[in-house]
Amino acid sequence: MKNAKMIGFGLYTPKNLVENERLQEFLETSDEWIRTRTGIERRYISLDENTSDLAVEASKKALSQARLSAEEIDLIIVATVTPDNFTPSTACIVQDKLGAKNAWAFDINAACTGFIYALKLGRSLIRSGEANNALIIGAETLSKALNWEDRGSCVLFGDGAGATVLTSTEEDCGIKCVNVKSDGSKGDSLVIQGLPLNSPFKDGREVSENYINMNGREIFKFATKVMEESIVEILEKENIKIEDIAAIIPHQANLRIIDYVVKRLGIPREKFITNLQNYGNTSGASIPIALCESIDEGNLKKGDNIIMVGFGGGLTWGAALIKL
């Protein structure tokens, strides 16, 4: 049976690097306060590049590594909560900028779990024969959704993009399994407000502040629970031992969350790939950025089994087992 194999990887960040110390210039915070509570030391903040721009640059690298032209791509999925516009979709903008004229393109919004959701869709479409070469992208410019006066949230996030090319294969490799779940009843724990209902037929006009609003305590409890459960579930479902897993790539939200899960599972800390100290929380881009960086640095190789695990607004969560 056909499967979807990863054959190209690319990441991209804006040029504007913001160390923790720069945040002290306008926030009541410090490098020590941020590092001890989150593990974050720096992040990239876009000055003039939108989500599609970051996605395009990451995609160019992935296509180059895959040795495919843009015209050979027949599917583009962008996972993002910070699109350029409501419409056209960021994926359609990426399609145009790349010259991928044979691809159909759309966005999905599953917040920080978005890349895992996108992998599930890409894999399913390739297995069904609806696509042959798919470009799967996680890209965010979260800086435009931040309240830069709220030190509890604005210090956490960064901008960036990661992309991978999936292709159809008969080989015993690729995306082995993807489990995703949702719980909309707890969606108010992490919100970026949309436009309010605001018509001339309604009494009074509403004003919306489209900032990230997060209940940190609730998200911590949720994240640690579902990350642990997702890892255990996918190991049991695929009948694979943790010793056979080369690496686990978690959503890069907070070092405390990752360390808590490591302790709960009793898995060696070195199996967990973390790079949030350099990028912050890039939402749907965090897992592909960590994946691509690990590939680039030679920390992952062909034949390795890896688990990606994420959680995010919605609430959403999920995990994927992949043989590179």
From Swiss-Prot:
GO terms for molecular function: 3-oxoacyl-[acyl-carrier-protein] synthase activity; beta-ketoacyl-acyl-carrier-protein synthase III activity. Its EC number is 2.3.1.180. The last Arg residue of the ACP-binding site is essential for the weak association between ACP/AcpP and FabH. It comes from Clostridium perfringens (strain 13 / Type A). GO terms for cellular component: cytoplasm. Keywords: Acyltransferase, Cytoplasm, Fatty acid biosynthesis, Fatty acid metabolism, Lipid biosynthesis, Lipid metabolism, Multifunctional enzyme, Transferase. It is an enzyme of class 2 (transferase). The lineage of its organism: Bacteria, Bacillati, Bacillota, Clostridia, Eubacteriales. It is found in: Cytoplasm. Pathway: Lipid metabolism; fatty acid biosynthesis. SUPFAM superfamilies: Thiolase-like (SSF53901). Homodimer. Belongs to the thiolase-like superfamily. FabH family. It catalyses: malonyl-[ACP] + acetyl-CoA + H(+) = 3-oxobutanoyl-[ACP] + CO2 + CoA. The active site is at 112, 251, 281. This is Beta-ketoacyl-[acyl-carrier-protein] synthase III. One of its GO terms (biological process) is fatty acid biosynthetic process. It holds the Pfam family ACP_syn_III. Residues 252-256 are annotated as: ACP-binding. InterPro entries: ACP_syn_III_C, ACP_syn_III_N, FabH, Thiolase-like. Catalyzes the condensation reaction of fatty acid synthesis by the addition to an acyl acceptor of two carbons from malonyl-ACP. Catalyzes the first condensation reaction which initiates fatty acid synthesis and may therefore play a role in governing the total rate of fatty acid production. Possesses both acetoacetyl-ACP synthase and acetyl transacylase activities. Its substrate specificity determines the biosynthesis of branched-chain and/or straight-chain of fatty acids.
